[in-house]
């Protein structure tokens, strides 16, 4: 018989054990390392180790990445695959919450939602910035940076691949982390010695390996039968592996990876609530009394229940006493306050440990000043600083690769070591309060600055309008302000 008050523990069904927690073994995020790419690809022992790396990637690392992907998309693995209420007569809602996607999207847009500014150190050639701007334009680099940062936030790692297209333009493209891994050397610098791209098409792995001077393709094979048969080998002139690995942090962990158990508990709590509300509609009818004296049979009770009517008439028992009858429903007790407090606590813990501020917190919204707001976001600020450190390494390697290929083919020089990268956190700024405070402190602000900070106009547009009102011709306006930003006659 089902026990009334053990619903929330999930032990009121034939499934006596419910385990939804996930644990990724150390190999699932292990860095692959070897002495050199030549030994790894061309010696018997190296090939054996290389085959083991590929198998470990498919059997262990890719599984972790797929689980993280499911949480980022809201198809939370545990709630959908865990053993829960298997009784056919009971509700079995699997309520998913896109916490993973929310956390990664919030953190990514905060850190890199605004374009990264590239500058140069004093004494560096300024003309190289024009070359960099052309490369960024050709590759829609702001969108690419956003995608890379999002992958890093979800998976803990992200990959970009470099090549030159048929028109001789520098290309940088995103590679799915579920389809690539890198191998690093055994030095303290842990340099990348090769990158392995393993996309699967028609159930076949179409593997390509990139070394510091070669691109090697292999004949297709299945994931459960790795075969290292070289198909083609071509040279490249990057003088390094043309792949950049972006790290999210020191441990290559996703922003919500440590909070998965909390997300699972939140999903389970909401699912249990939904199940309770559904099962309450199917509560068991209880009739107490001398049913024999009432003359009721099981079929009589069933007919009355179907008619949504229950008639109970008392009478006199055989010994002359008055009979009694009572009817009601048995339903499982639900501690509303306790359950809601539990789910709120889980939600707060998810925010706390992921360092993502809870924007629905009244205490958060009550804060109006910018500096106080930043204090409440101090946790996310620490995450941002850490991400920027690793993203800067990736960006510098990006331009080192481009610099290498430009030197090899006599294209415009890029001094990667002299580039600076400035990140701009995507947070609302009260610019007008700053301007007001600056003016009150004795500072002078130009009309151009004031107009450019207005949401409804800008300097060129407004100056053009003013000149036009004074009778200036279109040619005069063009010479003075360079034309207006809006289409006006």
Place the predicted regions along the sequence by residue:
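Extended, helix-rich architectural segments
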Residues: 1-173, 489
């Amino acid at each position: 018989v089902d026990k009334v008050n053990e619903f929330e523990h999930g032990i009121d069904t034939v499934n006596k054990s419910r385990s939804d927690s996930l644990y990724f073994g150390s190999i699932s995020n292990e860095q692959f390392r070897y002495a050199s790419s030549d030994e790894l690809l061309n010696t018997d022992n190296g090939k054996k180790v290389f085959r083991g790396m590929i198998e470990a990637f498919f059997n262990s690392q890719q599984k972790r990445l797929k689980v993280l992907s499911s949480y980022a998309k809201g198809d939370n693995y545990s709630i959908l695959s865990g053993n829960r209420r298997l009784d056919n007569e009971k509700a079995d809602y699997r309520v998913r919450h896109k916490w993973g996607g929310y956390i990664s999207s919030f953190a990514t847009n905060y850190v890199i939602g605004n374009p990264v500014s590239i500058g140069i150190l004093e004494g560096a050639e300024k003309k190289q910035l024009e070359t960099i701007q052309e490369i960024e334009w050709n590759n829609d680099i702001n969108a690419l940076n956003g995608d890379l940062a999002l992958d890093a936030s979800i998976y803990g790692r992200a990959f970009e691949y470099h090549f030159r297209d048929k028109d001789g333009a520098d290309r940088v493209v995103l590679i799915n982390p579920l389809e690539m891994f890198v191998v690093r050397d055994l030095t303290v610098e842990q340099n990348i010695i090769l990158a392995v791209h393993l996309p699967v098409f028609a159930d076949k792995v179409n593997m390509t390996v990139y070394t510091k001077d070669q691109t090697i393709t292999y004949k297709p094979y299945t994931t459960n039968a790795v075969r290292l048969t070289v198909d083609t080998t071509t040279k490249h002139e990057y003088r390094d592996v043309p792949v950049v690995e972006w790290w999210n942090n020191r441990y290559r962990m996703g922003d919500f990876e440590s909070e998965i158990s909390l997300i699972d508990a939140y999903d389970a709590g909401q699912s249990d609530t939904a199940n309770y509300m559904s099962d309450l509609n199917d509560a068991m009818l209880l009739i107490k009394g001398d049913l024999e004296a009432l003359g009721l049979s099981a079929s009589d009770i069933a007919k009355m229940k179907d008619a949504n009517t229950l008639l109970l008439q008392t009478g006199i028992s055989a010994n002359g006493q008055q009979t009694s009858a009572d009817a009601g429903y048995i339903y499982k007790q639900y501690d509303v306050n306790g359950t809601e407090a539990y789910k709120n606590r889980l939600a707060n813990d998810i925010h706390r440990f992921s360092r993502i501020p809870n924007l629905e917190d009244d205490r958060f919204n009550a804060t109006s000043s910018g500096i106080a707001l930043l204090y409440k976001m101090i946790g996310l600020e620490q995450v941002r600083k850490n991400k920027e450190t690793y993203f800067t390494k990736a960006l510098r390697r990006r331009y080192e690769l481009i610099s290498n290929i430009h030197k090899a083919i006599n294209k415009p020089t890029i001094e990667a070591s002299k580039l600076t990268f400035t990140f701009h956190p995507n947070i609302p700024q009260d610019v007008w309060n700053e301007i007001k405070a600056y003016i009150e402190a004795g500072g002078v602000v130009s009309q151009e600055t004031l107009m450019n900070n207005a949401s409804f106009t800008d300097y060129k547009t407004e100056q053009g309008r003013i000149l036009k009102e004074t009778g200036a011709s279109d040619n005069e306006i063009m010479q003075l302000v360079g034309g207006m930003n809006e289409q006006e006659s």
